[in-house]
Amino acid sequence: MAYAQNPYRFLGALRRRYGDTFTLRTTKGPFVVTADPALVREVFAAPPDTFRVYPADVLGPFLGEKSLLLSHGERHRRDRKLLTPPFHGGRMRAYGALIAEATRAHVATLPIGRVTPVQPMMQAISLDVILRAVFGVHDPVRTEAWRRTILDDVRAVTPALIFIPQLRRPLGGFGPWARHLAARARFDAMLFDEIRERRRDAREGEDILGLILSARYDDGSAMADEEVRDQLITLVVAGHETTGTSLAWSIDWLSRLPAVRDRLQTEVDALGDSPSPEAISAATYLDAFCNEVLRVFPILPDVSREVVRPFTLGSWTIPARAAVAVGTALLHTDPRLYPDPHRFAPERWLDKKPSPFEYTPFGGGARRCLGAAFAIYEMKIALATIVRVLRFSPANEKPSKPARQNITIGPHDGVLVVARKR
């Protein structure tokens, strides 16, 4: 339970006691954690069929059993190849304008001069980006229907349900599990209706769902409806909460560090009145700022895998069915890698390219987050859009603290700030 409540503190205490690599004894067997970059390289460089996702029994009921995050081996390779194109290159950049549009719409509703938790707005921006980019939903009535159904589903997934499987019982239609099942049934119905309508009308479109439906495996077959549904649920769950939370942490830092805020605003202002998404994405200090946000408060404290067959890690042999985790939160706060690691300093990235074995906010290797490039792209455009028109001051003297929020870690108070127009 200590890990579930505050994994940053829990893992940090273990490293201070045992060093960069240590083993936890859990009810599921040995759980090996490493924050040694040389060993991280070994984990990420291992053949893809060395591992499978861990713990699948925790995530499966919420993401769908055929989710890319849960698949392994040949199925993972095939699905990842099919799903990759919309999240990279020109396909991804085509969504820049709609990210800015969604951000402007929500910024216009933010109370000015009053204490406001900013995380809900950031997650609303992220959700609207998903609705537009993934589902092609722009109409206000349809947007509200989708938004309500998705939020009901997301809010029904509580940390208790995730970490205490014994709670996953219907109890005659009452209780948290019954609420989750009911919300998921409504979301499933909406997703299947959309998938089948697209297939029936041969209306694929240029949104991510359309690209998935039109994509084909090497043998010419398409992804089945149930598999498409599980990928869409994963995109919503993984994309909505995570990017919105990183944006909220971004505002927290901007509200507390005037020099950082001013430097970022100066860079964004210099791009002109209507900068292109490409110009925003190429801004160097903005890139460094986003890297630093994800270093200090990574959304996931570690990247864990189950060992499929015995695996050699350094001088140790990890048995099958044990787990291996890359300690992201430990790597990111290692003073040997990042001097003064608890200081928020975007400039540390201006002359340093992130090492994939020292900086792992999106995991690494063959299972690196499929949407990593899209998430960074969205962060940059949303932040540039926001800082052009608003400034923030903190509502509390003490900064927000990381706390468990469903699967991920986020600010305990939603980041309380006061917004003012520039």
Which ranges hold each PLM region?
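Conserved cytochrome P450 K-helix/beta-meander segment immediately N-terminal to the heme-binding cysteine loop
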Residues: 48, 310, 326-353
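Conserved cytochrome P450 K-helix E-x-x-R motif and the immediately C-terminal K′/meander segment
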Residues: 2-19, 193, 275-314, 335
